[in-house]
Curated annotation (Swiss-Prot):
The keyword Transferase applies. The gene is araB. GO terms for molecular function: ATP binding; D-ribulokinase activity; ribulokinase activity. GO terms for cellular component: cytoplasm. InterPro entries: ATPase_NBD, Carb_kinase_FGGY, FGGY_C, FGGY_N, Ribulokinase. It comes from Staphylococcus epidermidis (strain ATCC 12228 / FDA PCI 1200). This is Ribulokinase.
């Protein structure tokens, strides 16, 4: 009998699980919101610019230390039977550290400087830097495997943002890294990087390394910054990042033989958690945002796909990533905008407002739907890679009920996913089955039904809202030698299927006109006249 620990750092909260390595059964689970939340409107009563999303690294350490202690005590397992620890984290969430590995926001003279804080993945303050990087890559092949684009959420644009907006922060930062790398470095008392984070978000290749020619063309200082502050030993997924350091051995009472995995991006960890580890399996990790992931034995350049990295999920395979930056956040926004009569009716039925909205929306026939939404309320990641784009609603009349708008929000996220899927299929990477992971698919059968019919694919919903945490635990089990390969760990520890939604041919056909309208509006406001979206 052996156990592994999976630590999952999400957008607003963190989770820690203790899992049985033989079958993936979750024995104990801890979850807590980040104590300081996300700074997005103000910091120490000073207003923040639009699209700023900052966090406090101390919250991560609180989750780490309290969470692991809790699951060990709650489970009452023999601590000597814990063999490994895995970590997943949102990305690209960037942290700036001093010589002592302390976050710069802990410095008294920097605590009111927003650039000293962790830049959360959805921080979009670096769009100008991302645009300039795209401009400097014209007529080059530097971005072939990044969808010929650069996203403002990634590491390098965020570093350039700090160089331009707060050069003193860059001067005082000794280390710049993904927050996931910060956690694993602390756990192992070393300075290491994961190939998953640095490959997808830092323009690093497992054969060529960092693209310093590209960096120099963007800013002559950038190669030096990356070499001095970002370079470190890079560990691939499936390998051990090292043993748990003595300090944490003593704090938690764990064995000196406990191994730590390099961190994996949270959505990528969800692929492991659902067991979608074969070619042709398309995983949509649906949470506050959606990350779309596929594996293939080949690396091919795909326009508008946000990256492909070898060994980033399963050793020997290329992982492909795309995404939508507002899905759960979009539904939450819709709930908060619901008119009073909807809220009152939900209360009368003793139902959460979101559940009641979906109940009403489920009675709208596809043929009755006359509202189409561009779901860009937090910009667009794939396939346009433009965080300046804003959302739009088309087809409103004085008779439009609010639940029709809510249904259109759900449909828009499905249409966006279909556009992303088409990019893969047009490049000879076929999609056979869609796995829906994250908390939302289990809660919303309407969403799953809409996705199956819009995509015209079988959608498999996994019976776990802990897929990312479980994927991290699989990594811990693998490096802790409970399994000889990560693939074996994933197949043995994956969670069971909750249900399968098959597409219904009549509804598949009914959605085609709506999808066509979405595509026309998408190209009109996203490609031909994006400035109109900026003005809205």
């Amino acid at each position: 009998m052996s156990y592994s620990i999976g630590i999952d750092f999400g957008t607003a909260s963190g989770r820690v699980i203790l899992a049985d390595t033989s079958n993936g059964h979750i024995i104990s689970r801890y979850e807590e919101d980040y104590a300081n939340g996300t700074y997005m409107n103000s910091l120490y009563d000073k207003p923040l610019p639009e699209n700023y999303f900052l966090q406090n690294a101390d919250d991560y350490l609180q989750i780490l230390e309290q969470g692991v202690q809790f699951v060990l005590e709650d489970s009452k397992v023999n601590k000597n039977d814990v063999v490994g620890i895995g970590v997943d984290f949102t990305s690209s969430t960037i942290i700036f550290l001093d010589e002592q590995f302390e976050p710069l926001h802990r410095h008294e003279d920097l605590k009111t400087n927003p650039h000293a804080y962790v830049k959360l993945w959805k921080h979009h303050g670096a769009q100008d830097e991302a645009n300039y990087m795209i401009q400097m890559s014209k007529n080059k092949n530097w971005l072939d495997y990044y969808g010929s684009s650069v996203n403002s959420e990634w590491m390098i644009p965020k570093i350039l943002e700090v160089k331009h907006e707060a050069p003193e922060i860059l001067r005082r930062a000794r280390y710049i890294m993904e927050a996931g790398d910060y956690i694993t470095s602390i756990l192992t008392n070393s300075n290491i990087r994961s190939n998953c984070g640095i490959g997808f978000k830092g323009f690093w290749d497992n054969e060529a390394g960092f693209n310093y020619d590209f960096f120099h063309s963007v800013d002559p200082d950038l190669p030096k910054i990356v070499k001095e502050k970002c370079e470190a030993p890079i560990i691939s997924i499936g390998e051990s990042a090292g043993r748990l350091c003595k300090d944490y051995q003593q704090i938690w009472g764990l064995s000196q033989d406990v191994q730590v995995s390099p961190f994996i991006i949270d959505a990528h960890s969800g692929v492991l958690g659902v067991g979608a580890i074969e070619a042709g399996e398309f995983t949509a990790v649906i949470g506050t945002s959606t990350c779309h992931l596929m594996l293939d034995s080949r690396q091919v350049p795909i326009s508008s796909i946000t990256g492909s990295v070898k060994n980033a999920i399963i050793p020997g395979l290329y992982a492909y990533e795309a995404g939508q930056p507002a899905v759960g956040d979009l539904f939450e926004y819709s709930k908060n905008q619901a008119p009073k009569h909807i809220v009152d009716q939900a209360n009368e039925h003793h139902m959460p407002v979101l559940n009641y909205l979906e109940e009403l929306a489920s009675h709208i026939r596809i043929e009755e739907q006359h509202v189409v939404v561009l779901d860009w309320l937090n910009g667009n990641r794939s396939i346009l890679s433009n965080s300046h784009l804003t959302g739009s609603i088309f087809g409103l009349t004085l008779q439009t009920p609010y639940e029709m708008i809510h249904r259109a929000y759900i449909e828009a996220t499905a249409f966006g996913t279909k556009l992303i899927m088409k990019q893969f299929e047009d490049n000879h990477i076929p999609v056979h089955t869609v796995y829906a992971s994250g908390g939302i698919p289990q809660k919303s059968k309407l969403l799953v039904e809409i996705y199956a019919n819009v995509l015209n694919k079988r959608v498999v919903v996994i019976d776990s809202s802990n897929a990312s945490a479980l994927g991290a635990a699989m990594l811990g089990a693998n490096v802790g030698n409970a399994y000889s390969t990560l693939k074996e760990a994933a197949l043995s520890m994956k969670q069971p299927i909750a249900y399968i939604q098959e597409p219904e041919i009549q509804k598949v056909q009914a959605y085609k006109p709506l999808y066509h309208k979405y595509c026309e509006l998408h190209d009109l406001l996203g490609r031909q006249y994006p400035e109109l979206s900026y003005l809205i």
